[in-house]
């Protein structure tokens, strides 16, 4: 069995492609069940964020397993395979392990070192367990990656001063207008909306309206910023709020655009401009709004220029983080390679146990039934103790052997000397 990751990210695919493959949490159980139904996928889980969709899997046949994952993505996004392959990346074995460690540490994020991804990796692990996708290998891998991400944030300064998607979106607007004089509307009341409010207030915004379907969630958000006096608006009045606003941020979990050229037309009559900043994936704002003369629209891919200026000063911190990651990669690799010994050890124990039982039966039959009944438990314990003591030290040394080639040679010798039949499980 081997570990593989197949996916795409902000580095390989535009938002138009990423949004088609986004898997919302409500659909995750169905997706994992579908993936596990393929014949060559043993374990699987999915990281799905606004900037990446990555499927981590333990496969019994690497080539066939990757083909199955690619086919799943093509069907999920309704994207022809020939088109999809241009945007996908595939990483195998240690490269897949290293990639997850880098993702958890924030080194693969649009915003280098951002902290939100570690929580998303942790959620991926928990949901993978909940929906029976994560088994022994992925469980250990994700735990090691979470440890790696936590170490990077506590032992380096990479998380200090990092911009986030939300802060980059606010900075993008701040560079173009004076936020203190603008009426700002936020559609959505989740974590991203909360961060938007925080960064808007820091940049001097004073007139902020929250539009959301759930009045309770809107109020919960407003309670976190009592000094801001946020205006709360039900979703039914969304277009009234937009018509009165100058800047609109969208951050909802909608799977289809909620704003488009047709439904915004009435909001821009008799006005010079409306700025739309969509930080959702899938997008909340349809591409056709770019045709509207009064509208300036941006999405997450437009934030790269803002983010780039924050990256240069963080490269040295990233190098420190990479050194830590190598330690965690080595720790996982040592554990993973030790699994190679399991089938051989099990086969040897089974063979020795068969011999013990056969010889014990012969001895008891010679001793007679009266003696056997009286002393069988003692003799049984004696023979088990001898077998366990003989096998214990070689097994400990075999598992502890860090030299991969030396361990493989030991395994080959055991198979030959004891004529063991071993089913290979890991490669």
Curated annotation (Swiss-Prot):
Assigned keywords, A-Z: Chlorophyll biosynthesis, NADP, Oxidoreductase, Porphyrin biosynthesis
Gene3D superfamilies: Glutamyl-tRNA reductase, N-terminal domain, NAD(P)-binding Rossmann-like Domain
Highest taxon, organism lineage: Bacteria
GO biological process: chlorophyll biosynthetic process; protoporphyrinogen IX biosynthetic process
Active site: 50
Residue positions binding substrate: 49-52, 109, 114-116, 120
E.C. numbers: 1.2.1.70
UniProt similarity note: Belongs to the glutamyl-tRNA reductase family.
PANTHER family: GLUTAMYL-TRNA REDUCTASE 1, CHLOROPLASTIC (PTHR43120:SF1)
Chain's role: Catalyzes the NADPH-dependent reduction of glutamyl-tRNA(Glu) to glutamate 1-semialdehyde (GSA).
Other notes: During catalysis, the active site Cys acts as a nucleophile attacking the alpha-carbonyl group of tRNA-bound glutamate with the formation of a thioester intermediate between enzyme and glutamate, and the concomitant release of tRNA(Glu). The thioester intermediate is finally reduced by direct hydride transfer from NADPH, to form the product GSA.
Protein name in UniProt: Glutamyl-tRNA reductase
Organism of provenance: Synechocystis sp. (strain ATCC 27184 / PCC 6803 / Kazusa)
